[in-house]
Amino acid sequence: MTTSLGTHYTWLLVALPLAGAAILLFGGRRTDAWGHLLGCAAALAAFGVGAMLLADMLGRDGLERAIHQQVFTWIPAGGLQVDFGLQIDQLSMCFVLLISGVGSLIHIYSVGYMAEDPDRRRFFGYLNLFLASMLLLVVADNYVLLYVGWEGVGLASYLLIGFWYHKPSAATAAKKAFVMNRVGDAGLAVGMFLTFSTFGTLSYAGVFAGVPAASRAVLTAIGLLMLLGACAKSAQVPLQAWLGDAMEGPTPVSALIHAATMVTAGVYLIVRSGPLYNLAPTAQLAVVIVGAVTLLFGAIIGCAKDDIKRALAASTISQIGYMVLAAGLGPAGYAFAIMHLLTHGFFKAGLFLGSGAVIHAMHEEQDMRRYGGLRAALPVTFATFGLAYLAIIGVPPFAGFFSKDAIIEAALGAGGIRGSLLGGAALLGAGVTAFYMTRVMLMTFFGEKRWTPGAHPHEAPAVMTWPMILLAVGSVFSGGLLAVGGTLRHWLQPVVGSHEEATHALPTWVATTLALGVVAVGIAVAYRMYGTAPIPRVAPVRVSALTAAARADLYGDAFNEEVFMRPGAQLTNAVVAVDDAGVDGSVNALATLVSQTSNRLRQMQTGFARNYALSMLVGAVLVAAALLVVQLW
């Protein structure tokens, strides 16, 4: 371990936003006037520390760049010793810069977006708590500390999604997100228990060193349990249903959850645990299947959503599916998963903040059927949203082209039927993404004006537009900077490993042409449906079965209700009935017997001496009779 300033100051990454959250949440109304400024300062300070640590890492050789800081011994309990240890390596640094950088821009944007909210100070406190938890998650050097950050992110998301708690829909959405994430958290916790019982430690270094000697069955079980946790946190099938409802929170929350923090946590967990998954092919196959299914699942849902935020939420489910698919490919895909995660952070944050500007301009209206023709009224929002749109659909040379194209090529490179299925799913997802995002673009900024009478859309203030502009710049250039020359792949190689260049199932130019071809088809179909014909202000009732299913989130909630909720409720009622009739019934019967016996005995206590004398005489006769019987026997 190389001694450097990073070994002394890494803890500030977590401490600064955590201190900001503590001051804002416990300081009360005294911080109302300047609380938003403190929240932004804490986020920017964390980004500054991250930039300082990056400069420190760049000054050293690749294999010596990891920064370790043991703050204190946290849990010394027999065979279990857990240190409050922090680790910044090449993988962690990618997340630190994304979380703190994009998170800071979202903080600044929120100054304008939440300007009229009386609880703005509390909102910034929750944002700081979210940032601190996510940073702890990615800089922890062991699974226990990661789990603390994991739970902190879950708590902060619950608070932010339900921030407007006076709205029943927001309170319900917060509870739904919290409960569904508890399912994944339980899976991750059991996976950690199994990890400790197998390796005797929960530190990354100790676990990964022991992986080669472990049973493949145990590694598979651990991998599947960790995948369950990742599915909940990153909204992957079958635990994706909470993400659409999470749009009930303020729009900056959507940007923070979808772009820079929460939904990327599952991808981080899988890539960080790469040495384990590399030796558990069954678990790795499950990761690939989940990613492929989810990227199509989310894309189909996005095609039928009229609420602009819910359409973008569906796109997040799909785009995270691409990342999970890439992570499931092992060393061949880890770097591409992280590349898409980073580029997605820019263009998805830009899309959500742009949608927030549109909603702000349209007086909280979120139905795209009530938009139309907004490009003239919102020129900056239109330009920044448009650049992010080109990035997400994968038009060269925008960011998404490089990262998504790399995943498609890696999927096709898996070879055989597996490669054909995975590559086909990735290509189909790219075409559907182009369709629904073009639909969003056309319904919002083009066509006739479908505004309600009296609406006067206006551009957002500078404090909101400048973060959008910076994110648009990232949407344009980040992909090329990370991909050209294998920059990100070489940067991550000491952590995620490398693989020999496999024989491509298709030449690179063919894979790229196919990807651009399906994107062009998606754009053309969307233009034909939404660019050349009037769009009704009310969604048609008579639609195809697929559209109806997509509007209902492919019946994800109905599936959970029928498969889990109702059987669970019936089981609970049965257990309660057994408890009432059996356990409680036995206790109550015994109490009744004792009560009745005592009542009868009490009636025998008359208070008259002759009754007591008679009782004594009867007792003596019975004793004498018993003795006589014994003697005769």
From Swiss-Prot:
Its EC number is 7.1.1.-. InterPro entries: NADHpl_OxRdtase_5_subgr, ND/Mrp_TM, NU5C-like, Proton_antipo_N. Keywords: Cell membrane, Membrane, NAD, Quinone, Translocase, Transmembrane, Transmembrane helix. It holds the Pfam family Proton_antipo_N. It is found in: Cell membrane. Its main location: membrane. It is an enzyme of class 7 (translocase). It catalyses: a quinone + NADH + 5 H(+)(in) = a quinol + NAD(+) + 4 H(+)(out). GO terms for molecular function: NADH dehydrogenase (ubiquinone) activity; quinone binding. The chain crosses the membrane at residues 8-28, 34-54, 95-115, 123-143, 188-208, 209-229, 251-271, 284-304, 322-342, 382-402, 412-432, 468-488, 505-525, 613-633. One of its GO terms (cellular component) is plasma membrane. GO terms for biological process: ATP synthesis coupled electron transport; electron transport coupled proton transport. It is a multi-pass membrane protein. The keyword Membrane applies. NCBIfam families: NDH_I_L, PRK06590.1. NDH-1 shuttles electrons from NADH, via FMN and iron-sulfur (Fe-S) centers, to quinones in the respiratory chain. The immediate electron acceptor for the enzyme in this species is believed to be menaquinone. Couples the redox reaction to proton translocation (for every two electrons transferred, four hydrogen ions are translocated across the cytoplasmic membrane), and thus conserves the redox energy in a proton gradient. Belongs to the complex I subunit 5 family. This is NADH-quinone oxidoreductase subunit L. It comes from Mycobacterium tuberculosis (strain CDC 1551 / Oshkosh).
